[in-house]
């Protein structure tokens, strides 16, 4: 295989971990990186790697083969010809041009095609985290300053990340003598070969801890409840996210903290609708206001403003209130509020109102026959007339 994966490192367990330890580590990590719960970049791939590692280490036969050959497939996992392949893998098949030969080269040189394998003792950035923040409609528009608290894996305060008991220090690994790698014999397509792999005692660090820290038990990390100040920018929308650098989990080997991604969940407004920086509001308008025109007060998120309604305004007419929408992110001004009027037809008229409308109809040259009463009323009148 082109890249040798350290499944023990993926699950964060030692090579002599029992089945229960492996199962607990898998459950913890799969919950943490599940794509439905963690939308941070790289979380989905991490989840796949965790599942792959567990599928191998939870199966006694696959684990034994992996421990012996570095592959769950046994010796054929290192460039051996599969059935019906005539002894060669596909040339130029997206693996750097040498197909299965990259797998064999990796046994000698620690990487595909002789490339260098990643140094397991090198500093690595910690995992990213995600935090969902609920906002009201108005908070999303105007922004706010707040504090949030969440659980994360931090550098152990007792040993400062060394994993060693205070007053002691890690010592040179007795197995790899500080190199981080050991030579092992593996069966390949060319027979038994000596190859290099990450030391199973020190995990590639070149150091081993004789006396472990009583707080973190040698991991160098501990769980903490972390609280930080957050400035929510004005104009955020539902589903948008903001990155806070190095507010995630602690790195390994002295690497930096990961990042925290805050995902905003904005509650809908009972009055307004929003699309980007534009805010929409629908208001009722009486028949008289629409016909004669009027000057009315209209609510906006910035406060009430005057709006002139021209005479003869039709239902569904839209008016634009400049600068009364939501702020545009990155300081590009403020959007507008779009007001749509709905002309209301009166449902219940008194005699005076009916008379006025009849006069209006006559003045307009309309011959209107009012439809009075309900169907039940008209039926009653018909029976009365027949007596």
From Swiss-Prot:
Quaternary structure and interacting proteins, as annotated: Homodimer.
The family database entries (Gene3D superfamilies) matched by this protein are listed as: DnaJ domain, Heat shock protein DnaJ, cysteine-rich domain, Urease metallochaperone UreE, N-terminal domain
SMART domains found in the cross-reference section = DnaJ (SM00271)
Where is it localised? Cytoplasm
**Domain comment quoted from the record:** The J domain is necessary and sufficient to stimulate DnaK ATPase activity. Zinc center 1 plays an important role in the autonomous, DnaK-independent chaperone activity of DnaJ. Zinc center 2 is essential for interaction with DnaK and for DnaJ activity.
Record key words, sorted: Chaperone, Cytoplasm, DNA replication, Metal-binding, Repeat, Stress response, Zinc, Zinc-finger
State what protein this is by name: Chaperone protein DnaJ
Where in the chain are the CR-type zinc fingers?
143-225
Annotated residues for binding of Zn(2+) 1: 156, 159, 213, 216
Task: Tell me the residue numbers annotated for binding Zn(2+) 2.
Answer: 173, 176, 199, 202
Report the cofactors. Zn(2+)
The function of this protein is: Participates actively in the response to hyperosmotic and heat shock by preventing the aggregation of stress-denatured proteins and by disaggregating proteins, also in an autonomous, DnaK-independent fashion. Unfolded proteins bind initially to DnaJ; upon interaction with the DnaJ-bound protein, DnaK hydrolyzes its bound ATP, resulting in the formation of a stable complex. GrpE releases ADP from DnaK; ATP binding to DnaK triggers the release of the substrate protein, thus completing the reaction cycle.
In terms of superkingdom, the source organism counts as Bacteria
SUPFAM superfamilies found in the cross-reference section: Chaperone J-domain, DnaJ/Hsp40 cysteine-rich domain, HSP40/DnaJ peptide-binding domain
